[in-house]
Amino acid sequence: MNTQYLQYVREQLIVATADLSGATKGQLEAWLEHAQFDTGTYKRKKPRILDEVTGRMITLDNPPISGKQSYAKGSSIALVSQVEFSTSSWRRAVLSLEEHQKAWLLWSYSESVRWEHQVTITQWAWSEFKTLLGTRKIAGKTLERLKKLIWLAAQDVKNELAGRKTYEYQELASLVGVTSKNWSETFTERWVAMKHIFLQLDSEALLLLTRTRSKQKATFSQQNIAKLD
């Protein structure tokens, strides 16, 4: 899967997971637009009669009556928009992925800020990074600083893929509380390894997403054909 196609999948995922709830009308607004009725014999205004005793006009209450809609103001909106319907296969495929892949894609491309996604991403990535470290002994303070970097690496890769500003080494050194020299000697190589973990996660998750979507669409098509037979 080349870079151009990966970007296409990202764009489809952004649209598929966008919050389009504001595009629909509320219940009261819809009711107001469709509340005009033609009652035929009965007038819209309540009838008024003269009270022979007091000489005053009295407004009578009409009983409930059935009616037919005369016209509708505005336009009706479907329960599911065309965009939501056409991108449903992408959402279905995302939800079928493994937890860390699903968490990464939703956090990266749907702007989901759910704490569970962030925890899943960092725990998985830290496990992968520890595997890369192997059995090498690392000082306790260094290990704690590396744990802080794993989440910063996730944010950095997300920003990089979106074309936004990424961290400078001097900025990272300040964030973890080390000198520029210490950063260069101890953390630069490991930082690059962390970012590679997330970049690989992104490409593999997107690839699996397209394969899962294709399989699901093929399965649904076969089911529909079987029903017709």
Swiss-Prot record:
> Which residues span the membrane?
none
Write down the Pfam families for this protein, in alphabetical order. Answer: Phage_antiter_Q (PF06323)
Record InterPro entries: Phage_82_GpQ (IPR010455)
Q: Which residues bind DNA?
A: 14-32
Ordered alphabetically, the record's keywords are: DNA-binding, Transcription, Transcription regulation, Transcription termination
The protein's GO terms of the molecular function aspect are: DNA binding
| Any single GO BP term | DNA-templated transcription termination
Origin, by domain of life?
Answer: Viruses
What family is reported? Belongs to the phage antitermination Q type 1 family.
Function statement: Positively regulates expression of the phage late gene operons. Bacterial host RNA polymerase modified by antitermination proteins transcribes through termination sites that otherwise prevent expression of the regulated genes.
Q: What is this protein called?
A: Antitermination protein Q
What is the species of this protein? Answer: Enterobacteria phage 82 (Bacteriophage 82)
List the top taxonomic levels of the source.
Answer: Viruses, Duplodnaviria, Heunggongvirae, Uroviricota, Caudoviricetes
